[in-house]
């Protein structure tokens, strides 16, 4: 009986080839579009779901009297907010918009390889308390107290050092002069950074860098915008608070 039904179905398909082909293609396109829409809707709805404090994190924005948003918050405003000590707020953290950098990376003693277009975000020491990145190697505490400390993401650490090599303690030499760098920094860079930790990859659907893959974080960056000497000239930051 089953064979009879299969034969009848095949005869029907062969009898109306063009019509059935159009139906199959249309159904396939419909399923594909539905799958893409479902994926995109889940991608958007799960923004920041990787952060364990998601429900307690809020970002702070400045608006004009007309309601237009500024591109960031001045460092002086952040310092004033921290002094006010709101009862509803555990802590503040501020970051800088991610930007590409180029480095010569110490693979082993006496050997360096160039790596360009590494998407880098400068953060402060309270970033971990607010966003709770998972530490795979090294120590965030050590990085917080080390000048020019670098925290690699897992995928970048694997790409540069492979599975067996330990990246902690390796140096990365900046090969460019950042626009935020002091006047004493050469045009070719030459500033040394030290890898102090490796964290789990930060997904693309986060408010930190939506649809941009982060390769690394920097702390206590002498060439960046969070250093005190730069607050008067580069003064726009992204500010997040951890609520009680």
Explain the meaning of each model-derived region:
Residues 37-106, 114, 228, 233-244:
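Membrane-proximal extracellular/periplasmic loop immediately following the first transmembrane helix
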Residues 31-34, 41, 47, 84, ...:
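Phosphate/oxyanion-binding loops and surfaces in catalytic or ligand/nucleic-acid-binding neighborhoods
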Residues 1-7:
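Short, membrane-interfacial amphipathic segments enriched in basic
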Residues 7-11, 45, 82, 158:
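Solvent-exposed, non-membrane alpha-helical residues enriched in polar/charged side chains
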Residues 12, 16-44, 55:
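Short, strongly hydrophobic transmembrane alpha-helices
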Residues 124-136, 152-244:
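Mid-to-C-terminal secondary-structure elements
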Residues 62-70, 93-126, 136-150, 175-193, ...:
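Short acidic/polar micro-motifs at solvent-exposed secondary-structure junctions
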């Amino acid at each position: 009986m089953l064979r009879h039904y299969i034969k009848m179905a095949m005869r029907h398909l062969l009898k109306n080839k063009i019509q059935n082909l159009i139906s199959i293609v249309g159904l396939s396109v419909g399923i594909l579009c539905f799958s893409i829409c479902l994926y995109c809707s889940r991608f958007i709805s799960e923004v920041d779901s990787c952060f364990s404090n998601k429900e307690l994190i809020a970002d702070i924005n400045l608006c004009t009297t007309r309601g237009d948003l500024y591109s960031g918050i001045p460092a002086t405003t952040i310092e004033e907010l921290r002094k006010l000590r709101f009862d509803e707020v555990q802590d503040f953290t501020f970051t800088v918009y991610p930007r590409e950098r180029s480095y010569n990376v110490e693979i082993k003693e006496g050997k360096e390889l160039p790596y360009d277009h590494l998407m880098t975000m400068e953060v402060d020491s309270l970033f971990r308390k607010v966003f709770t990145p998972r530490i795979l190697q090294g120590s965030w505490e050590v990085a917080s107290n080390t000048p020019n400390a670098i925290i690699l993401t897992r995928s970048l650490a694997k790409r540069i050092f492979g599975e067996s090599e330990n990246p902690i303690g390796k140096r990365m030499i900046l090969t460019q002069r950042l626009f935020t760098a002091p006047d004493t920094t050469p045009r070719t860079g030459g500033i040394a950074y030290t890898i102090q930790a490796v964290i789990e990859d930060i997904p693309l659907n986060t408010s930190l860098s939506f649809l941009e893959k982060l390769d690394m974080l920097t702390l206590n960056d002498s060439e960046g915008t969070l250093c005190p000497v730069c607050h008067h000239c580069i003064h726009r930051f992204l500010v997040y608070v951890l609520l009680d």
